[in-house]
Amino acid sequence: SYCLKNYKELNNILKGFSIYQSNFEMKTGLINSILNSKLLYTHVVGHGLIINMKTLNELGNFNTKFWCEDIYLGLQLKFNNIKITPLLTLENMETPSSLENLIKQNSVWFKTTSQFSKIYKDIIKNYKVTNKLNGLIGCFNEFRCALNWIGFPIILLLSIIGALILKNYLIVLLIIASYLLYICINTKMTIKLINILDEQDYKTSLKIIFFAAIATVISNIGPIYSIISNKKVKHKTER
């Protein structure tokens, strides 16, 4: 899936987030699933999922104890050696129409991702599993995802600030140039894949890359909000 359905209606920051989320969806939902490595982070998306009903019932259907049932189900599949096979047909989804809604949506996802140890214990306790090690690797990947989500922007900004304090402007330029190159490659690959698989004609521009870079720098605002607010009731999200 990708998140450009309402792209033209969004402000520039949210356009950047639509690219950021599309980058993530294409990498973890498509590319990592095709590579089929237990060491890579993969996930399922409930509203685009095709699964045998008997298998789903054996797994206890969609879990509602944790806020994001897709993450829970994805880990259950790993615990039972059920391969996640991506469909080469993409769904074009909407990006939240306001920054507030996007933050709340991301906080819901992050809360479940960060509860990887609770999910592990819940699955082991309540369901039959066939491969604990594979499930443990899946939970570790959720930990890596949560750590990267909240930590990458912080490390990036601290690296730039540290180099500025030391007046090492060459390092500052190298960090910024490397980061922009990373965003540029990610965005171009994502747009190209979308155009091929969904027969679209999206264009990549410097403006798109710039706002995708801005969105990535502040992409941890949802996780930070989740930690600070520590909500006990799930936010109602747009998707």
PLM regions and their residue ranges:
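Catalytic donor-sugar/metal-binding loop of nucleotide-sugar-dependent glycosyltransferases
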Residues: 65, 74-92
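A conserved hydrophobic position in a structured secondary element of the catalytic/binding core
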Residues: 51, 69, 87
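C-terminal, non-catalytic tails of nucleotide-sugar-dependent glycosyltransferases
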Residues: 112-133, 222-229
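Membrane-embedded multi-pass helical conduit in multi-pass membrane proteins
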Residues: 144-230
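Active-site donor/metal-binding and catalytic loop motifs
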Residues: 87-102, 119
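Conserved glycosyltransferase catalytic-site signature
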Residues: 47, 67-72
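Long helical/loop segments within the catalytic core of UDP-sugar-dependent glycosyltransferases
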Residues: 1-64, 107-110, 114, 118
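Loop-to-transmembrane boundary segments
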Residues: 128-150
